[in-house]
UniProtKB/Swiss-Prot annotation:
Gene3D superfamilies: 6.20.440.10, Aspartate Aminotransferase, domain 1, Type I PLP-dependent aspartate aminotransferase-like (Major domain). PANTHER family: GLYCINE DEHYDROGENASE (DECARBOXYLATING), MITOCHONDRIAL, GLYCINE DEHYDROGENASE, DECARBOXYLATING. It catalyses: N(6)-[(R)-lipoyl]-L-lysyl-[glycine-cleavage complex H protein] + glycine + H(+) = N(6)-[(R)-S(8)-aminomethyldihydrolipoyl]-L-lysyl-[glycine-cleavage complex H protein] + CO2. GO terms for cellular component: cytosol; glycine cleavage complex. It is an enzyme of class 1 (oxidoreductase). It comes from Staphylococcus saprophyticus subsp. saprophyticus (strain ATCC 15305 / DSM 20229 / NCIMB 8711 / NCTC 7292 / S-41). Its EC number is 1.4.4.2. InterPro entries: Aminotrans_V_dom, GcvPB, GDC-P_C, GDC_P, PyrdxlP-dep_Trfase, PyrdxlP-dep_Trfase_major, PyrdxlP-dep_Trfase_small. Belongs to the GcvP family. C-terminal subunit subfamily. One of its GO terms (biological process) is glycine decarboxylation via glycine cleavage system. It comes from the Bacteria. This is Probable glycine dehydrogenase (decarboxylating) subunit 2. Keywords: Oxidoreductase, Pyridoxal phosphate.
Length: 492
């Protein structure tokens, strides 16, 4: 296969007068748009769309697809992202015409099947999480975080405790946690980790006070370590009048083993695009449902989908609702994929998913422990963080090793996160990878570790085989080329 190092943009392929498809002869009056729309909405100049033949168009997108990388292309151990295989049966279900061609503004009587899917998925997620009610509206994980925090805020205000304006986040937390807290109008307060990578209970007691609104936790946490003192954490925060929020990014490690609701969490968000096999990695669409305990149910976004006398309907009568958080009812196509996955796997299957995810992560950790610094040596859950500090002694950083992995057809793990691990590399293999794939990855990681000692330039100059070499990251940050006009100016 011939692969070009550089591909012309679709605009650079454009030649005036070329076209790929002939539209039927128009039957609409030329002036119809002007009659229907206010002048301010009408374009004054023609859109600068590329003009290409159909063959050129097909080749352009085929070439781009060959350069893309996804979980169907190769191993994708991106820590905290759960890049598991997306079963193709999901796509078949999502393309059933009755689902794919429905419209959110259709009458409830015409979309009973779609509403049944929404309601059934709500019920499944309630069972999986141990929550009493679930809304599917939020469009992504961070959106779910914000939604839950707005529910917490409304709850505290209704109870006459609007002064609670602090949200506690661990120093190993996802960056979205403090960002969501700030966006919801709270102050983020950091709690330290102890030497085992868990929440430091003494430090938690220090930061909890009368202004504590909530604590945001992932369990297992971002280091892949289960917070074994979770019940103590629950008691400390609840006794201070605060609430517990569960970031569902790492639910893949504990399905059908333990539920957030049973650990004392008051609200949870899930990532259907991670744990429940919605395709992601290209920017979406995602889905971040939020589940809550009964004390918070009256604050959920409206509408909710309910079942009355075997009929499914939207319920807008939610007393203390924070209001709608997403147009229509969220990203329905992802609901279909998640529901298909849950029903395909069943309870036993989901339990086996978590067991395999944990086994795979610990297998990699065991194979790499003699070649890399492992800051937290105990057994992990679904992911773990290693440190490139040994390799840094030879002038090779984690970024360089990540670039070198590209030469072996592996997507690099998450790097420099969480922030409390020097030269961190967070590895999450998921349950869907074979032992052969895990061994290939480990072999290449060990090879890179040896190169860092014996031939560091080979790592420092990587990648060697990719279409794009290393970017000038400083220039990309300060002088980004974001539009075709920028590129044209650069070339001139």
């Amino acid at each position: 296969m011939v692969v070009s190092k550089s591909s012309p943009l679709i605009f650079e392929r454009s030649k005036k007068g070329r076209y790929a498809y002939s539209l039927p002869k128009k039957e609409i009056d030329n002036g119809a748009v002007e009659k229907l729309l206010d002048d301010k909405f009408i374009r004054k100049n023609k859109a600068e769309l590329p003009e290409v033949a159909e063959l050129d168009l097909v080749r352009h997108y085929t070439e781009l697809s060959n350069k893309n990388f996804g979980v169907d292309s190769g191993f994708y151990p991106l820590g905290s992202c759960t890049m598991k295989y997306n079963p193709k049966i999901n796509e078949k279900i999502a393309r059933i015409p009755g689902f794919a061609e429905s419209h959110p503004l259709q009458d409830e009587s015409q979309v009973q099947g779609s509403l049944e899917i929404i309601h059934s998925l709500q019920e499944e997620l309630k069972e999986i999480t141990g929550m009493d009610e679930v809304t599917l509206q939020p469009a992504a994980g961070a959106h779910g975080e914000w939604t839950a925090l707005m529910i917490f805020k409304a709850f505290h205000q209704k109870n006459g405790e609007g002064h609670r304006d602090e949200v506690i986040v661990p120093d190993s937390a996802h960056g979205t946690n403090p960002a969501s807290a700030a966006f919801a109008g709270f102050k983020a307060v950091t709690v330290k980790s102890n030497e085992r990578g868990e929440v430091d209970i003494d430090d938690l007691k220090r930061v909890v006070n009368e202004n504590t609104a909530a604590i945001m936790l992932t369990n297992p946490n971002t280091l892949g370590i289960f917070e074994k003192n979770i019940m103590d954490i629950r008691n400390i925060v609840h006794e201070a009048g605060g609430l517990l929020y569960y970031d569902g990014a790492n639910l893949n490690a504990i399905m059908d083993k333990v539920r957030p609701g049973d650990m004392g969490f008051d609200a949870v968000h899930l990532n259907l695009h991670k744990t429940f096999t919605g395709p992601h990695g290209g920017g979406g669409p995602g889905s971040g449902p939020v589940g809550v305990k009964k004390e918070l149910a009256s604050f959920l976004p409206k509408p909710m989908v309910v079942k009355e006398d075997d009929v499914y309907k939207y319920d807008n009568d939610i007393e203390n609702s924070i209001g709608r958080v997403k147009p229509f009812y969220g990203n329905f196509g992802i609901y279909l994929r998640a529901y298909t996955y849950i029903r395909t796997m069943g309870n036993k299957g989901l339990e086996e998913v978590s067991e395999a995810a944990v086994l795979n992560a610990n297998y990699i950790k065991a194979r790499l422990k003699d070649h890399f610094e492992i800051p937290y040596p105990q057994y992990c859950k679904h992911e773990f963080v290693l440190s490139g500090s040994k390799q840094k002694e030879h002038g090779v950083r984690t970024l360089d090793m990540a670039k070198r992995l590209l030469d072996f057809g592996v997507h690099p793990p998450t790097i420099y996160f969480p922030l409390n691990v020097e030269e961190g590399m967070m590895i999450e293999p998921t349950e869907t990878e074979s032992k052969e794939t895990l061994d290939y990855f480990c072999d290449k990681m060990i090879e890179i570790a040896n190169e860092a000692k014996e031939d560091p330039d080979k790592v420092l100059e990587a990648p060697h085989t990719t279409i794009i070499d290393r970017l000038d990251e400083t220039k990309a940050a300060r002088q980004p080329v974001l539009k075709f006009e920028n590129l044209r100016s650069e070339k001139e």
